[in-house]
Amino acid sequence: MRPRGNTQEDYLLRIIRQAAELLRQLRRRLLGGEASAESIRQDAAVAIDFLLGSQGPVLGMLDAISAARLVGHPAIVELWCALLDVEAEAAEASGDPTFALRCRARALALRNAARMLWGETNPLAEGEPSSE
């Protein structure tokens, strides 16, 4: 009989894989020009909601350190940042540089917070699904 894995860890890995795939699709669409920047921006926001789950609204209001600590997993924080980067690129392309700047600033703050909490490691390069 196969030993059962940690259910919470399995769930996190599944969410990480699915969000990484959404990120790949969004990047492809953004680079390919096959969809409007506004639809990519909206889909990036939906992907962030999926990744963060019911805590998303609260996490969006917290400072970066508190948000990263509450997320609790460096790969999820990095995916969140990567999705914010896509959202920023799409906002820039759709003529909203102010929103793009806010997204980029939040991604930078979250990355810095993750470094403070977990060090310099790249969680997506160490056995987690790649977002590229």
What are the language-model segments listed below?
Residues 1-77, 112:
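N-terminal alpha-helical interaction modules that lie
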Residues 4, 11, 30, 85, ...:
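Hydrophobic/aromatic side-chain positions at a characteristic register within alpha-helices
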Residues 14, 21, 76-79, 83, ...:
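The tetratricopeptide repeat
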Residues 18-19, 25-26, 80-83, 87-90, ...:
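Structural register within alpha-helical repeat arrays
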Residues 24-34, 88-91, 95, 114-115, ...:
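Short coil/turn linking the two alpha-helices of tandem helical-hairpin repeats
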Residues 41-45, 97, 101-119:
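TPR/TPR-like (Sel1-like) alpha-helical repeat modules
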Residues 61-65, 117-129:
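Long amphipathic alpha-helical segments
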Residues 71-76, 91-101:
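Short acidic, glycine/proline-enriched loop segments that cap or flank alpha-helices
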